[in-house]
Amino acid sequence: MSDLHGHLPNPEQIEKVDVVVICGDIVPLKIQRASMFVDEWLRNEFKEWIQLLPCERVILTPGNHDFYFHSAPRTKLEDTLNHVGKKLVYLEDSSYIYKGVSFYGCPWCTGPLGWAFCPGNSMLFHGVYKEIVTIEDMYNKIPECDVLLTHQPPSIENLGTSFHWDKARAKDWGSDRLRVHLKDKNILVNFSGHVHSGDHERILYPTLGCDTVFYNVSIKNEQYKVAFQPRYILLNKEDKTIIEMGTTKMITLD
């Protein structure tokens, strides 16, 4: 799932799985720029939710609304993550292997200046003011892996197309450069979010020169209302197959 923006789905309505993946924008909108309140939220509501989820691991990469993860000094961030507990695995340009399945998380996005994990602007990055490197530098770090978590989707068909209220306003917010970097890479599945109203169906893109399966797993729409259910898949690493176990069909809005 992705783009929770503070909404924590009822754990009793989540099916039992091995791993839950979250592709960013978890922090409530109303406090997203208030580090003290975000830290408190992570240590309390978020921690309790993580512990109640019916899974063994929760693997998270942040998004452009998650300013706390971008700006907090690394020692502070590590302390907060340790407080949440070992069940949560935080991936920021880093890898993790669970039961032989490799995961990599890339939070970086192409986008306007002033947002978290958007290169090209001078801002507080883990407690130090610095000029953020280019998006290519961050994409170059992406290795071959079984499961790739990116906040922004690659520009592939309508995966990152925002339709808002009508197709006349459609715009592709996917990353062309991410699509180029994924070309010919051996990645089984790429989960992303960022664009709430992007195509949530299974997408294949054979012209990319790979067999990667792409999913937009945001759970909110462009009006920040819960609109999609979590996506469930069964990944069989031995024969490189992905079986869909559930859908993200539109649900009744609040």
Residue ranges of each PLM-predicted region?
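Active-site neighborhood of phospho(di)ester-bond hydrolases with catalytic His/Asp-centered motifs
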Residues: M1-S2, V20-D25, R57-N64, Y90-D93, ...
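Active-site environment of divalent metal-dependent phosphoester hydrolases
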Residues: H5-N10, V27-I31, N64-A72, S95-I97, ...
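Core catalytic region of metal-dependent phosphoesterases/phosphodiesterases
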Residues: G6-Y98, G174
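Active-site-proximal segments of metal-dependent phosphoesterases and phosphodiesterases across multiple
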Residues: V27, I31-R43, E144-N186
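Short, electropositive alpha-helical surface patch
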Residues: A72-Y90, A168, D172, I203-E222
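Binuclear metal-dependent phosphoesterase catalytic core
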Residues: I97-K99, V180-K185, H196-D254
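Binuclear metal-dependent hydrolase catalytic cores centered on His/Asp/Glu-rich metal-binding motifs
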Residues: V101-V147, K167-R177
